C-alpha cells in the first residue's frame, strides 16, 4: 500500500466576515422582536445525549435537530438570554478587531456587577463556557472562528511550509523542536506540501524518536504529536490537512483503551462536541498500532503491562481501563471484526502495550521496521 | 529600571566527549578492581533530604557530600550494581551514536531476562529511573548530557535566532505558534539575540495574549511559556539564556501558591533535583507578578478566587493551597520582607488571583500597562 496525497474535498474556509454576518443577523432578529413589542428569543440546539446520533453514512457523531427556545421574558431564561447577548457583543468585538481571547479571558472580561444591583453577569467560568458552546451550535461556527481560542498542546514536524499571517516557514527546518500548534489554526495556510501522509503520534517521546530516526524525511511523512488526547487545534489541523490538502491520516497510539479512545476522538468526534464533528473529526483516518496482535507478532510479551482497574467479571468491576474498554466495544464505529478482535483480546489478556515498548527491539526498530512494514503491507485498522 | 543584556558568566558547555570520558574512567576503575581481585564498588552521593542544603552564598539548593558505597559482592547491592553497569553501557552507546532516548525507552531497551535465570534486569521503570539519577550525581552531568531526554513542554517566541544542528531560524517568525522546546536543549545555540530580557510565563493563554499584543517586539522581550511547572528543558534553557547569553530573567505566574512554587523552582531548583541546581536553576531571576498587592493596586477584588484546601487554623488543615503556602513561608529563599508580605497576605485573605483576571480591565491591559509599568518602575520581587 503506497500512501499518496489525494484530491481535496474541502476548501480553506476561514472568513471572519461570515461570522460577523451571522452574529449581526441574529442580533437584528432580536432587535426587530424588541421593536415589535414581542418577547425576543433564541433557538438553541439541545445539548446532551438525547440529541446526539451516529450518522452511519457520514460515519460521524452528529447533533440532532431538537431545539430549545430561550425567551427574554421568562424568569428561568432571562439570565442566560442576557449572557448570550453579552458574549455575542464580545465575540463581535474580538472578530472585528482581529483579536483572540481564551475561554478564561472571555469569562473575566465579561464579569461585572450589573449597575444598581448586586447581581454579577457571570459568577463563574462554568456559566460562560456553555453559552459559548450554545453560540457555536446556534451559529454553526467553531469557537475558534469566533476568536475564542482553545487550550494549546501538540507540535508538528515535517516537510511542509506553514503560513501564519506574514510568517512562512518549513516545519522540517526547526531543529528537533518542531512547530508548536497554536490554539487556533483556522487562519493557517499550507503553501507547500512535500509529504505523502500524516502520522499522528500520541506521545512526545515517540514523536521525538521518529524525528531523530529521520522517519519524516525517509517516509515523506508529517509527524503530528498530540501529547495525550488531541487538542481541538490539533484535531482541526488533522481535519484540514486531510480534507483541504488531501493527505491520508494514520494514527499511532499506545495499545490500550486510552490510546484507542484518542484515535476514536480524532476519527469520529466526541459526544460532548457532536455539533463540531463535521469540522473537527476525520472519519477516513486509519490506525496503525499498537494492537494486541502486535504483542505476539513482534514478541513483546515480556514488556506488556497489566490493564488498570477491575475487570467486568470481578466484584466492583468494570472500572478504569476495563470500563473504557467495555464502552469502546459498544461504539458503533468499532463494530467491525478488526476492532472487536483487538478489544476482546485486550479484555481476555488484561494487558496493554506502549509505543515505547518497541524500544525493547532497538531504538531504530519502530522507524525502520515496525511502521514502514505495517503501512506498506496495509496492516491498518479501519 | 531598564533591562539590558549583561555579560555572560558561563560558556556553551555541551561536550559529548567529556561525558564519554567520565563514563570510561569510571568503567576502567571497576575493571581494574576486578582484575586485581578486589570487590568493585561505586561511590554514589546520598539522596534524600539529609544530604541537601541551601547554599546562602550561591543562593542555590545544593547536594551535600555524603556518599554511599555500592559493592558488587554484597547481596544487598549486587542488583543495583549490575543495573548501574547496564545503564552506563547504554548511555555510552547513545552518546557515541549521537542518539537520544526517553527514560521510558531506556527502561524498555534494557529490560531482559538474565540468561539461565528467571531474573529480569529491571522489573519496572521505578528501578531504572533512580539509577539514571545516581549516574547524574556520580558523574556530575545532566541526564540530558547523557542523551536521556526529559518530558517536553513549553514554547518560545521572540526575536532570537536558534541553531539546532543544521537548522537555523528566528523564533519570532513562526506565526503565533512559536518554537516547541525539545526535551534536550544542551546542543542548541543562539547565533543572534535581539531581545533585552526573557519573560517566563506560566500559562499558554497568557503567553498567547502577549504574542497577539506584540509585546515581544515592542518590549524587546523573549517569551517562554512554561505551560504549568517548568519542564527540565525549559529550566535549562532559562539558565543558559541567563548565564551564557546574559539575559535578565523575569517570571510572570498566577498569584497563588502554585504559581509561586513554579517561580521558586526556576529560581532556586528543587529538593528532588538538588544535585542539578547549578545547571538548572537561575537564582538571579526576578518575579513581576501576580502578587497579592496587585489585587488592590489594580482593583481586581471582584475577580479573585478562593484558595483551595483547609486553612491552618481550621480542623484538618492546612491542606491544598494552604499547605503549600505554609511551606513557602518557610523556604529560606522567601525569607525577605517582600515575599513574607505577599505570602502572609494570601494566608490572611484566603484568595488567589490569576494572570488572566487582568483581562477584566481589557485584553491589552496586561501588555500595554501592567507589565511595562511594573518592569519600568522596578516593582519586582526578589
Swiss-Prot record, chains A, B:
Gene Ontology molecular functions: ATP binding; DNA binding; DNA topoisomerase type II (double strand cut, ATP-hydrolyzing) activity; magnesium ion binding
Pfam families on file: TOP6A-Spo11_Toprim (PF21180), Topo_VI_alpha (PF20768), TP6A_N (PF04406)
Signal peptide (from-to): none
Coiled-coil region: none
Q: Which UniProt keywords apply?
A: ATP-binding, DNA-binding, Isomerase, Magnesium, Metal-binding, Nucleotide-binding, Topoisomerase
EC number(s) reported in the record: 5.6.2.2
Query: Which GO BP annotation is one of this protein's?
Result: DNA topological change
* Lineage: superkingdom: Archaea
Identify the enzyme class.
Answer: isomerase
**What InterPro entries does this protein's entry cite?**
Spo11/TopoVI_A, Spo11/TopoVI_A_N, Spo11/TopoVI_A_sf, Topo_VI_alpha, TopoVI_A, TOPRIM_Topo6A/Spo11, WH-like_DNA-bd_sf
One GO cellular component term of this record is: chromosome
Catalytic reactions of this protein = ATP-dependent breakage, passage and rejoining of double-stranded DNA
The entry's Mg(2+)-binding residues are 202, 254
Q: Which cofactor does it need?
A: Mg(2+)
- Role: Relaxes both positive and negative superturns and exhibits a strong decatenase activity.
| Name of protein | Type 2 DNA topoisomerase 6 subunit A
Organism name: Pyrococcus furiosus (strain ATCC 43587 / DSM 3638 / JCM 8422 / Vc1)
Gene designation: top6A
